[in-house]
């Protein structure tokens, strides 16, 4: 039987990279997937791909244009989810990302700091705040936040990004305690370097690739590696797992 059969999942930032790979795997495992994405073209393409992969298992996918920084946008996306699929079981707060203009606190702008906080941390907060009541109505479920290896290990020159991802890890633990009585499990994934198409382009002409490879003992990750962990955390296989920051980093945190 498909591991997510009968489940409805809401994935933010599902148009590319880890989000798209996760949407495809969720659909393959029988879930009805809502891809909440700000970019219409990538969101539609991801939904079409997920639908194609999920047919044999009963999976389906829907794209909903969503800006996780705006309450009205998230409310509308969740309303469309309930209208289309009737409930919400799984919330994957995946939207976020680093910026090339990040830097040390004495050099980075205040605007960049708030940009990182609003997209990564506030977006996770807002989608959880508005999504949890729907999960409660469904009888419980799973929330999967997206932290990073930088929440566990220093990354000089990325003080805005590390602040946001570290806060997400802390919030994940407190949410896990808060909502356990409601039968909601809350965990976060902390990836190392993941070779999405965007990251491949950034590293194409960079000498950093050799340095990164040396600290990732089993090789650099792919979006599919993170997606497999998300499937596990979304499924009943992890029924006793909550409050955990799950590193999928090829050993980067132990080097």
Predicted regions located by residue number:
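Alpha-helical segment proximal to the catalytic Tyr-Lys
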Residues: 133, 177-181, 239
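A conserved structural motif in NAD(P)-dependent oxidoreductases
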Residues: 215-226
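Short C-terminal tail/terminal secondary-structure segment
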Residues: 98, 102, 153, 218, ...
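Substrate-binding pocket helix/loop in short-chain dehydrogenase/reductase
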Residues: 102-105, 109-117, 199, 211-212
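Residue(s) in the substrate-gating loop at a strand-loop-helix junction
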Residues: 148
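Active-site loop-to-helix junction immediately N-terminal to the catalytic Tyr of the SDR YXXXK motif
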Residues: 154-162, 174
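Active-site helix of classical SDR
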Residues: 128, 164, 172
């Amino acid at each position: 039987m498909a591991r997510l059969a009968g489940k409805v999942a809401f994935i933010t930032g599902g148009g590319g990279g880890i989000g798209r790979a996760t949407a495809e795997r969720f659909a393959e495992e029988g879930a009805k997937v809502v891809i909440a994405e700000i970019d219409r073209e990538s969101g539609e393409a991801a939904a079409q791909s997920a639908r194609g992969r999920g047919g044999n298992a009963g999976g389906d996918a829907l794209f909903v244009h969503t800006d996780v920084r705006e309450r009205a946008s998230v409310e509308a996306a969740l309303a469309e989810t309930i209208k289309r699929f009737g409930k919400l079981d799984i919330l994957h707060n995946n939207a976020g990302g680093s910026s090339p203009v990040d830097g040390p606190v004495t050099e980075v702008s205040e605007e960049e700091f708030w940009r990182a906080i609003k997209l990564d941390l506030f977006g996770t907060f807002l989608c959880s705040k508005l999504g949890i009541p729907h999960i409660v109505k469904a009888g419980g479920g799973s929330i999967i936040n997206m932290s990073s290896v930088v929440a566990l290990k220093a990354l000089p020159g990325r003080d805005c990004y590390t602040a946001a991802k570290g806060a997400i890890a802390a919030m994940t633990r407190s949410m896990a305690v808060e909502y356990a009585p409601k039968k909601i499990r809350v965990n976060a994934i902390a990836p190392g370097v993941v070779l999405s198409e965007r990251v491949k382009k950034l590293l194409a002409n960079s000498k950093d690739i050799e340095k990164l490879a040396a600290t990732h003992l089993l090789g650099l990750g792919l979006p599919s590696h993170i997606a497999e962990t998300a499937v596990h955390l979304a499924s009943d296989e992890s029924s006793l797992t909550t409050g955990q920051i799950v590193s999928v980093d090829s050993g980067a945190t132990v080097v």
